[in-house]
């Protein structure tokens, strides 16, 4: 689906390449959802959405149930969503999305990586103009479904008319205004779509070319950032490698 599809296709496995870390990060999302809306998925739309994403990432049912149970414990940490942004090497914008129970630790970890690679960590919001903040929903394709009709129904929620279809997985991914997250999810569920997994993403509005050598350095920086458990996703405005095998 244009720039969003190009960017997400290249970044997908880099974000969720290590299964253990994937489950840790999803566990934090479960904790936040339970804290906000309770442990019952039928009464907590956000939790339903996170569980659908967990299933799509092959997170075992026992892990999901344990994460929900742990989230109700008195000793469960309170996670906070924080973003950190700045310029990495070669003038590439780097946007780091985190869930943390210790912002002092997290900002120190992130800053250390920026410094190591000759980057510069900026203030919150300093690079917001380089990325479009979107909500996204992935759901199973239904037999005989009319995507044009569905998109038309969702126009009032600022859903984009371009969408991403994965024939191998049998899923559709749509993008919309983050403020309309709950309304979009409700509409999709009322339409009978199954396993509606929702999330938020940042899509670069202009991709920058880099040389193979520059890409290697930037990939190392991204990998180093993603080693931290607090880091959920790292976004950049680096143009994906053509003909690469990231997915």
From Swiss-Prot:
Its main location: cytoplasm. GO terms for biological process: regulation of DNA-templated transcription. It is found in: Cytoplasm. Keywords: Cytoplasm, DNA-binding, Transcription, Transcription regulation. SUPFAM superfamilies: YebC-like. The keyword DNA-binding applies. NCBIfam families: PRK12378.1 (NF009044), YebC/PmpR family DNA-binding transcriptional regulator (TIGR01033). One of its GO terms (cellular component) is cytosol. The keyword Transcription regulation applies. Belongs to the TACO1 family. This is Probable transcriptional regulatory protein BT_0627. GO terms for molecular function: DNA binding. It comes from Bacteroides thetaiotaomicron (strain ATCC 29148 / DSM 2079 / JCM 5827 / CCUG 10774 / NCTC 10582 / VPI-5482 / E50). It comes from the Bacteria. InterPro entries: Integrase-like_N (IPR017856), TACO1_YebC-like_2nd/3rd_dom (IPR048300), TACO1_YebC_N (IPR049083), Transcrip_reg_TACO1-like (IPR002876), Transcrip_reg_TACO1-like_dom3 (IPR026564), YebC-like (IPR029072).
């Amino acid at each position: 689906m244009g720039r969003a599809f190009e960017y997400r296709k290249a970044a997908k496995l880099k974000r969720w390449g290590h299964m253990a870390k994937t489950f840790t990060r999803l566990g934090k999302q479960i904790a936040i959802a339970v804290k906000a809306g309770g442990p019952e998925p039928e009464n907590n739309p956000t939790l339903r959405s996170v569980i659908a994403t967990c299933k799509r990432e092959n997170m075992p049912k026992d892990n999901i149930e344990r994460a929900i149970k742990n989230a109700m414990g008195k000793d469960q940490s309170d996670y906070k969503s924080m973003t950190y942004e700045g310029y990495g090497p070669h003038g590439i914008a780097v946007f780091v999305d985190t869930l943390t129970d210790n912002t002092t630790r997290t900002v120190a970890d992130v800053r250390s990586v920026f410094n190591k690679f000759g980057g510069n960590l900026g203030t919150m919001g300093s690079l917001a103009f380089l990325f479009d903040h979107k909500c996204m929903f992935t759901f199973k394709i239904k037999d005989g479904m009319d995507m044009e009709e569905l998109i038309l129904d969702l126009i009032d929620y600022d859903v984009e008319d371009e969408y991403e279809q994965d024939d191998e997985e049998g899923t559709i991914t749509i993008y919309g205004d983050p403020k309309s997250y709950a309304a979009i999810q409700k509409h999709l569920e009322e339409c009978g779509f199954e396993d509606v997994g929702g999330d938020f993403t940042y899509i670069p509005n202009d991709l920058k070319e880099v040389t193979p050598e520059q890409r290697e350095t930037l990939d190392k920086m991204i990998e180093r950032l993603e080693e931290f458990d607090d880091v959920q996703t790292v976004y950049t405005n680096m143009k994906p490698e053509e003909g690469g095998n990231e997915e």
